[in-house]
Amino acid sequence: MLGSATIMSGGQAVSSLQNRVIFMVALICAGEAVYALPFHVTRFFRPTVLEVFGITATELGAAQGIYGIVAMIAYFPGGPLADRFPARKLLAFSLWSTAVGGLYMATFPGYVGSILVWGFFGVTTILLFWAALIRATRDWGGVYTQGRAYGVLDGGRGLMQAVMATIGAILLSLMLPDGVTPTIEDKEQALRLVIYFYTGMT
């Protein structure tokens, strides 16, 4: 009887560990994927973005500035929102909403549309997401290992960023013709595929 109880206890411990690992991996993937559309696309593919969107670097900076303003405001109600609603529901809604923004982004909306979509990303990635991510990570870490939890989260996000950027660069290069100067249509198709990739990851 004692042996059976020990085996059952050990099995429960393994199952609990597996669940914790899966949950943290999900947090890492979500925690980086949600910021891919507002940040990765312009960070790693800026020249193509400017040409395809038909905007200048200054106009792109203005759109990202709108993101910053909306995000700064969104931090304040984001905390109480995370305390009121389950973190998993907020994270899921944020990811889906950001993906919808990605579909609009893939239409290359120009300057005004860029202002709107980056402002929208400020709501979906901060108001709905950031505080919920922090809360879920804190709960995962418990009372004594919160620092370790945040370290694993940020380290994993860095790795996730590198993997996604590499795949995005490969997709872009595969879509552009070899040996000839790519046309604007070629660049549009290539960048759209990259945006769809990031949208799918979100």
List PLM regions with ranges:
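Central cavity-lining transmembrane alpha-helices of secondary-active solute carriers
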Residues: G65-G79
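Symmetry-related core transmembrane helices of the 12-TM Major Facilitator Superfamily/SLC fold
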Residues: R192-T202
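Intracellular juxtamembrane helix-capping segments at the cytosolic ends
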Residues: L128-G142
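C-terminal ends and interior cores of transmembrane alpha-helices
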Residues: W96-G110
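Glycine-rich segments within core transmembrane alpha-helices of 12-TM secondary carriers
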Residues: Y150-S173
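Pair of pore-lining "gating" transmembrane helices in MFS-fold secondary transporters
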Residues: Q18-R43
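Hydrophobic core of transmembrane alpha-helices in multi-pass small-molecule transporters
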Residues: G113-L128
